[in-house]
Design a protein with these regions (language model features):
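Carbohydrate-binding surfaces of carbohydrate-active enzymes
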Residues: 1-182
């Protein structure tokens, strides 16, 4: 079940490991063999063969996600109120909307082509920005530029009050759509 769940979520590289060959070692589980006392050990080979086969079949493809979520690593340090991006990610996942997290340096270097956010070889139809009272100026400048270039930008709950540098965010952000989390 866990392997299938991870595969469905896009994980296709697995490194199974046991932390300590000493058994029993309560501080370092799991023990795959456990001196023959692990009743599931004979099935472990089958699980690993299945995992290898599925991971191989699902690798090398082109990932398509239509939504980019701004990864606001600076939110906690900005001193204001903020929403964890996990809240937005959970809501998107519950509604089966695939997404990628985009940090500020990648967002600042991105461009908009034909109404889509283009990052490396990926393109996204919308950028979702979790609520944050303050956003770095570099981010508000990038979002303003992307809005002017025609990207659909959605701020969750409300626009930021100011930049992290305590500067006004500018009028361009007002063109973005404000949406509730749920």
């Amino acid at each position: 079940y866990l392997v299938d769940h991870m595969l469905v979520c896009g994980i296709n590289y697995f490194v199974p490991h046991a932390f300590s060959p000493k058994y029993p070692d309560a501080d370092c589980p799991p023990h795959f063999y456990a001196r023959g006392t692990n009743s599931q050990y004979p099935l472990f080979r089958e699980l690993m063969l299945y995992t290898k086969r599925m991971a191989h079949a699902l690798s090398g493809g082109v990932h398509v996600a239509d939504v980019a979520v701004y990864y606001n690593a600076e939110a906690e340090w900005s001193g204001g109120k903020y929403m964890l991006q996990q809240e937005v990610c959970c809501e998107l996942t519950r509604n089966q909307i695939d997404f990628d997290l985009i940090p500020q340096d990648v967002l600042a270097a991105s461009e908009c082509r034909e109404g889509k956010l283009v990052v490396n070889e990926e393109s996204y139809g919308a950028l979702v920005v979790p609520y944050s009272q303050y956003l770095p100026k570099r981010v508000t400048d990038a979002i303003s530029r992307l809005l002017e270039e025609g990207l659909s930008v959605l701020f969750v709950d409300q626009l930021p009050d100011r930049t992290s540098e305590l500067l006004p965010v500018g009028k361009t952000l007002e063109r973005a759509e404000i949406v509730p989390l749920k």
